[in-house]
Amino acid sequence: MRDDKTKKSKLSWSKKMVRKWFNIKSKTEKFQADVSLPQGVEVEHRNSFSEREPCTIKKSKTEKLNKNWEQQARQRKMNYENPRIIDVQNHSIFVATWNVAGRSPPEDLNLDEWLHSSAPADIYVLGFQEIVPLNAGNVLGAEDNGPAKKWHSLIRKTLNNLPGASSACHTPSPIPVPIAEIDADFSGSSRQKNETFFNRRSFQTPSVWSMEENDPSISQPRLDRRFSVCDRVFFSHRPSDFDPSFRCGHRPSDYSRRPSDYSRPSDYYSRPSNYSRPSDVSRWGSSDDDNGPGDSPSTFLNSPGSFLGSAANENGYRTPWNSSQYCLVASKQMVGIFLTIWVKSELREHVKNMKVSCVGRGLMGYLGNKGSISISMLLHQTSFCFVCTHLTSGQKEGDELRRNSDVMEILKKTRFPRVQSSADEKSPENILQHDRVIWLGDLNYRIALSYRSAKALVEMQNWRALLENDQLRIEQKRGHVFKGWNEGKIYFPPTYKYSNNSDRYAGGDLHPKEKRRTPAWCDRILWHGEGLHQLSYVRGESRFSDHRPVYGIFSAEVESNHKRSKRTNSHSTARVEAEELLPYARGYTELTFF
């Protein structure tokens, strides 16, 4: 009996290793999520396959056809009796990527400056690379999920720790105003105005509540975060086109109107003229009409009373942090790649059809030290796909082609099982079938310059010259990769490679023992699909890793259906009765009136 158990366990272990080595997928990918109990208590980390398990019972084609026909007929009848209204809402999404260089987080690691860097979002999508060292034991052996649990604990604690609970003021980072055009002369206008990009294109943590940019007598505060803005900068697609009544203290999800009610996409974020908001809340940003095409986004500072943690104002509006508890809807690890998604608790019931797909692109082209984790979900009636990747490394000429190949293989091999659900729910089976797609991660694209040349341009803060030699931009313009995808404008220094616990790039002349790597924007966020508007593109300044975290804030249009209730008031009844009395022959076109 004992021999049978030992033999069975050995077979089970060997089966797992073979599956891992050759990237053999199970019928459904497991992931972890919170379980909501009736009393409201959440239990972390349940293993799940999908929100609704794909049907595994084999049925005859006749049975399936009959069932589909019955469902369609029932759905048509329901739609006829209870017509639906499509309501478009805007939800904010915080997306971040961070290569943590194989370091496990300490318990006291402070994530506040990262996750609380802006007004609270409705959805947090956090992607990590190298949460474990990429050694042979972790790549070929059993998966080490210890660091993932630590990250879960830190993220949960940070998201659910409401700033301002101790009567302290929380000042959110504003959304910058995108005013630079794609072909703007980044360096020229700055020299004309005698300003540096580091000061102009950065959000500065305020030590005073207002300052004049050109006043040398006022000391400049320490730079904590550096912002960039959307690359799709053209009329009516900029946050600067927002209505002036748009306020910082209110999330994009507070606005809900139909597309037909607006003349341009940017008007989704504005309210009617007769709508009033609390007057004591600071704005997200200001208009860019006073700036030229080569100017950098202006720095906007909020007053200390503009954002109180959990207080309500006289009009009864509570700040966004009020009751903002977040729950984990999906979490997946593949060796060092780790993707976790958190949503506000009130949105949890509207998140459906959770599915996961992993593609290994590491050793032998199959193992998971490189590759992707993709999570598919349905929010109301809009499908989302979040892809977290760690692509092939290397700064030799031609390595970018291997990264291009990784992207194409991920798009080709990522497959989601079809969910057996109601006829009106979407169930995309690949990445590009989704309505909204966000791709994040350590893409490892380098700058095609020598170390000394790139370092000199970084010190000059000449981002344009650096971006002209950025491999991702070059390959994208040539149509070799990410064709039709978008990325925000970059106004921050390269995020890789830094010396340990330092703001200095590795490999300088004074440190010959360090590995010399040309500074590069390895960590990127791209998106695909209509209805996604990037509001900011940000670099963090944590020294925890040799990479700097990168994160962006998106406003996503989400469609939801509402059944139209039948009204039987006197006016509608009278109108129907009058129409029924009218004589008619074959159709409405042949009506004869008295």
Curated annotation (Swiss-Prot):
Broadly expressed in emerging organs. Mostly localized in procambium of growing organs. Restricted to vascular differentiating cells of young organs. It is an enzyme of class 3 (hydrolase). GO terms for biological process: cellular response to salt stress; leaf vascular tissue pattern formation; phosphatidylinositol dephosphorylation; regulation of reactive oxygen species metabolic process. It is found in: Nucleus; Cell membrane. Pfam families: Exo_endo_phos2. It is a peripheral membrane protein. This is Type IV inositol polyphosphate 5-phosphatase 7. It comes from Arabidopsis thaliana.
